């Protein structure tokens, strides 16, 4: 394995570990300790992901002009600071602001890693390398909740102390990201303006799919843990459920190769699994039912990323790669920001479980759109790459 790829994987593992330790608890902390309503949880989720709607576009431009490893280091440093500040927050506005910093930091994490992998690996191996990168990140997300559960149950740490431990964990990734600066030098200095951003408009079906998946995932990360807590799932069991979710995601990534060969069917299965998982959530009141939902959604929230990424990369010119990655990630930001706001408003107006039924219905509609546009979802070679 090439050293820069290994360093990217290690960085992803560490960052995922930190995220897994504290992210599932943030909505519970906000609701139980700070006293946030579901609408306020939606606002916190919105501010968390709102920067990801715009900053990846800026980062995409920087990827073609500056050292990708240093950009990654800057993002992880900001992330470290934002998690620590979360541990001393006292109000909903403070949490919202600190989560916005986290969103900004994440915009400097994912795109540089994708770009380094894209530069080092040839197109034939890129899907597997991106999937492995995601696998290490998911592995961290899977192990993190177990560590969080152990700390909460056996060492009797508070939520705030758990956030501080997460800060120490992610700080280690600053070292590995700095080592990547040796390999993160850009090989091109083209002028990236709206040309690369406009490339995303060539993929309307992919954009619709990404927005649905990311909207559901944004709700999953920011509202769903509080919903489980309201249905009598304890904090430690919430962490355990996210561990189970991680197992499902890792198992899915092991089959990226076969799934890639059936792109259309895999993407249809992705949407249907998210929709079905949300329907199970709607009817869930026990740990066992939530476990079933986590296992189903683990597939859907995993496989769409490497497949859609490869579709747009193979159908676009290499000169647009940096800006295109930024535009691709910004599309996630739109969904991540809209999801919590949508779920928060709907939960306050129609009931806490209504958003999940809504996602099921929307998922069926998106599936029909994909079926009607099958040819646009096939991975094909672009000779200009």
Predicted features by range, described:
Residues 1-2, 181-208:
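Juxtamembrane intracellular "pre-TM" segments in multi-pass secondary transporters
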Residues 2-49, 203-210, 214-231, 235-238:
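Helix-loop boundary and gating motifs at the non-cytosolic
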Residues 54-90:
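Conserved MFS/SLC helix-loop-helix module at the cytosolic interface between two early adjacent transmembrane helices
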Residues 50-54, 239-259:
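Transmembrane alpha-helices of Major Facilitator/SLC transporters
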Residues 55-67, 252-264, 347:
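Helix-to-loop junctions at the C-terminal end of transmembrane segments
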């Amino acid at each position: 394995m090439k050293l820069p790829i290994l360093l990217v994987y290690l960085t992803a593992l560490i960052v995922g570990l930190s995220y897994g330790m504290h992210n599932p608890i943030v909505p519970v902390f906000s609701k139980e300790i700070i006293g946030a309503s579901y609408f306020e949880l939606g606002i916190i989720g919105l501010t968390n992901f709102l920067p990801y709607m715009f900053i990846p576009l800026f980062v995409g431009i920087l990827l073609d002009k500056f050292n990708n490893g240093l950009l990654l280091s800057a993002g992880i440093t900001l992330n470290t600071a934002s998690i620590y500040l979360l541990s001393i927050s006292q109000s909903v506005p403070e949490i919202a602001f600190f989560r916005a910093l986290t969103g900004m930091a994440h915009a400097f994490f994912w795109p540089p890693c994708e770009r380094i992998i894209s530069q080092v690996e040839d197109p034939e191996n890129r899907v597997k390398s991106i999937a492995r990168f995601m696998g290490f990140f998911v592995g961290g997300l899977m192990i993190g909740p177990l560590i969080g559960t152990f700390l909460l149950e056996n060492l009797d740490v508070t939520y705030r102390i758990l956030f501080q431990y997460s800060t120490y964990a992610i700080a280690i990734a600053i070292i590995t990201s700095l080592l990547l600066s040796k390999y993160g030098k850009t090989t091109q200095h083209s002028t990236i303006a709206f040309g690369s951003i406009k490339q995303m408009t060539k993929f309307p079906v992919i954009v619709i799919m990404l927005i649905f998946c990311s909207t559901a995932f944004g709700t999953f990360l920011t509202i769903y843990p509080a919903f489980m807590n309201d249905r009598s799932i304890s904090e430690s069991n919430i962490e355990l459920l996210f561990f189970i979710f991680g197992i499902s995601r890792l198992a899915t990534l092991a089959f990226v190769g076969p799934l890639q060969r059936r792109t259309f069917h895999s993407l249809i299965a992705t949407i249907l699994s998210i929709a079905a998982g949300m329907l199970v959530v709607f009817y869930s009141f026990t740990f066992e039912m939530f476990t079933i939902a986590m296992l189903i959604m683990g597939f859907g929230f995993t496989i769409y990323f490497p497949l859609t990424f490869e579709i747009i990369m193979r159908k676009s010119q290499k000169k647009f790669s940096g800006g295109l990655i930024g535009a691709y990630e910004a599309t996630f930001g739109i969904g991540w920001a809209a999801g919590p706001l949508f779920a928060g408003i709907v939960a306050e107006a129609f009931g806490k479980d209504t958003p999940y039924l809504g996602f099921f219905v929307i998922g069926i509609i998106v599936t029909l759109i994909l079926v009607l546009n099958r040819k646009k979802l096939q991975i094909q070679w672009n000779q200009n790459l």
